[in-house]
């Protein structure tokens, strides 16, 4: 029997975790729903969680609370201690200088909290914002706390793919900076097998790379559970399509819409979202006057669930060579609603891998985009295996169940905390998670 340590309390305090991220509830786009749900789930599992994040701004790129600035707001949300820090919100999100100011402003804003870094047993930082990662690295250098890096997107690759950075020297510099910050972390995790392989090629200290997929957040799951199961329901004529989420350069959604517009395919396409290219889509739909297209704002969860229930296909587009780290996560809500997925992407991308593995619907390369209208005509005529896609979506949804993923994350976090960041202890403790 282990003897109690001198001065040890009969009831140990909960492990204290700091999560650093740019978006948090009420922001749902850009991973906000998942980041928030992880904090809530870890609180449920006995962690004392503090979240340092920006004021709500995404994907609209506007100060949604009216509080963004130099002030720090502190409050509790479902047991998590939330701290809001100011950030420069770009008016032109695809301009490189504005993106650099966006990243740098968040880093400087967060650095004000650095003296309180000793309060935590471990830090988890989410990337795509390198500014967040830079702060977490500074915290590690000062306080020597174990650092977990969760890579949702490779920022340098995303900047290149979206046209934010076009100069090869600038792109190389961004990748070098990204690699240096990444390799200060003790353990990495990411959201798809393709991303695991990419990260293993970037690591310099043999850090564990944990495959930890995202999941359907709890509140969205409850909204979908209120609706009847639509598995087995035949597609409509016209075929109902839904796109919902961020609308930026990486999606290349306008190109997809233009291809459908030039055809006489039988479809109705609802598009709901916001982001750097949303106004472009809205204006294009208004200009064309094509009644098959309908544009609306980012949907609240109840409305999103209803739209998923109504649609035949949930559409996900991913610009060629975009990396697409985030994109497979967009499929999770569609899978959970038992909707067939219509994807347009590179076959070797994370989304392409997901579509091959789960087969929840058709996957078109951009070079085969012209085949989509004829495909929709066949669907309307009952000539495609639509019920099988629905069944596959339902089967795959179980893989993204909230409880099992957060349980795995909580167990891995306890290993990280107990290891104190020791590389050998981390590799041994997380061997079954890689």
Briefly describe each language-model feature range.
Residues 2-78, 258-264, 430-434:
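N-terminal subdomain of nucleotide-sugar transferases
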Residues 111, 131-134, 138-142, 168-188:
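Membrane-proximal helix-turn-helix segments that form the acceptor-binding/catalytic region
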Residues 194, 212-215:
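Carbohydrate-associated surface elements
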Residues 210, 381-382, 402-434:
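C-terminal alpha-helical cap of glycosyltransferases
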Residues 216, 232-251, 257-261, 270:
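Conserved donor-binding/catalytic core segment of Leloir-type glycosyltransferases
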Residues 227-228, 367-373, 384-414:
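A charged, aromatic-enriched C-terminal amphipathic alpha-helix characteristic of glycosyltransferases
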Residues 238, 272, 279-305:
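Nucleotide-activated donor-binding/catalytic signature segment of Leloir-type glycosyltransferases, i.e.
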Residues 251, 300-307, 312-335, 341-353:
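Nucleotide-sugar-dependent
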